[in-house]
Regions:
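Acidic catalytic patch
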Residues: 71-92
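Short loop/helix-cap segments at secondary-structure boundaries that form the rim of catalytic
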Residues: 119-127
């Protein structure tokens, strides 16, 4: 696991790769999320991330349990957010609206992003604190 920022973590925003790593039972991701929940850190997951990762069935017990935790906020892509995501897509030249929503949400909340794809997120927001899994 690699961290790109030395600032203290105020909360975590998860991308699709983070949920897929949890689904696979990745011990580093499980430990990171367990510590975050124990410390009472807020966790956010954009709704598009859930849509990309969700396939249902018994394989996703860990993901379902995490999403059901009251400390985890699944952020909707409502009208205002969709417009902000569209503007940021235009400014950054990045066309993946889920990646852009992850970045926007983390930036708004002062969160660190847990990601398997730091290169794409760094294109959108070069200074965004990341934990690579």
């Amino acid at each position: 696991m690699t961290t790109t920022s030395k600032t203290s973590v105020k909360g975590l925003t998860l991308d699709t790769g983070a949920l897929l790593a949890l689904e696979r039972g990745d011990s580093r991701v499980r430990a990171l999320l367990r510590r975050a929940l124990e410390r009472g850190l807020p966790l956010s997951v954009p709704a598009g991330v859930v849509a990309q990762a969700w396939q249902g069935g018994p394989r996703q017990t860990r993901v379902a349990r995490l999403l059901a935790d009251p400390s985890v906020h699944v952020a909707p892509l409502d009208d205002m957010t969709a417009r902000a995501v569209g503007l940021l897509c235009g400014r950054s030249g990045h066309r993946d609206i889920v990646d852009v929503h992850v970045t926007l949400l983390a930036q708004e909340q002062g969160h660190t992003v847990v990601t398997s794809d730091p290169e794409d997120l760094s294109v959108i927001h070069p200074g965004l604190p990341l934990i690579t899994v």
